[in-house]
């Protein structure tokens, strides 16, 4: 459910762009959706986690710059910056001795610390790759970027989740 919730502003961005072919209008819809979503999550849980705050700041800054300056490149940079912030956060917390990935999902999944370390490095590499892929697409194939953002990056994430699931399946306890 969280994955679908996280995709809400992306879906609305895509739908708006598909209907209007206007990146500025799509950025405005994504900005409003991001702020409303963050407000709702804050109201419901009385807090936002670190990456939700980062996502909110980035949509306000990059979406706002896109709208105010009338330049779609700002909104196109947002996913790259978000992916790289995520990679930096995970790597930094891991190197500082507190595994951010374990802190965020460790209650649901019990793994040895060495596996949490490997999983963190997998995520760091994947997030760096995703940032580079987004940058590559929007700088080389600007007209196709919206489709890549909706379908390409989502497919890559699902593929990564499957690979991660296969990797983790060897460590998860089997129920009798």
Curated annotation (Swiss-Prot):
Main localisation: membrane
Keyword terms: Cell inner membrane, Cell membrane, Membrane, Transmembrane, Transmembrane helix
A single GO cellular-component term on record: plasma membrane
Entry's transmembrane regions: 23-43, 50-70, 74-94, 119-139, 150-170
Signal peptide (residue range): none
Bilayer disposition of the protein: Multi-pass membrane protein
Cellular compartments annotated: Cell inner membrane
HAMAP family: YciB
NCBIfam families referenced in this protein's UniProt entry, alphabetically: ispZ, PRK00259.1-3
Similarity remark: Belongs to the YciB family.
Functional description taken from the UniProt entry: Plays a role in cell envelope biogenesis, maintenance of cell envelope integrity and membrane homeostasis.
Protein name per Swiss-Prot or TrEMBL: Inner membrane-spanning protein YciB
Species, as recorded: Neisseria gonorrhoeae (strain ATCC 700825 / FA 1090)
């Amino acid at each position: 459910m969280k994955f679908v919730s996280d995709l809400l502003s992306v879906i609305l961005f895509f739908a708006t762009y598909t209907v209007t072919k206007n990146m500025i209008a799509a950025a405005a819809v994504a900005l409003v959706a991001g702020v409303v979503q963050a407000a709702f999550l804050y109201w419901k849980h009385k807090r936002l986690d670190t990456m939700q705050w980062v996502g909110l700041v980035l949509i306000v800054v990059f979406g706002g710059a896109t709208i105010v300056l009338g330049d779609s490149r700002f909104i196109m940079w947002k996913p790259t910056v978000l992916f790289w912030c995520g990679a930096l956060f995970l790597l930094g917390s891991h190197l500082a001795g507190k595994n951010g990935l374990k802190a965020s999902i460790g209650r649901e999944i019990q793994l040895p610390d060495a596996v949490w370390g490997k999983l963190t490095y997998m995520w760091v590499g994947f997030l760096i790759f995703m940032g580079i892929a987004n940058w590559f697409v929007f700088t080389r194939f600007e007209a196709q970027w919206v489709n890549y953002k909706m379908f390409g990056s989502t497919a890559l994430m699902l593929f990564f989740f499957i690979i991660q699931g296969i990797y983790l399946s060897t460590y998860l306890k089997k129920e009798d």
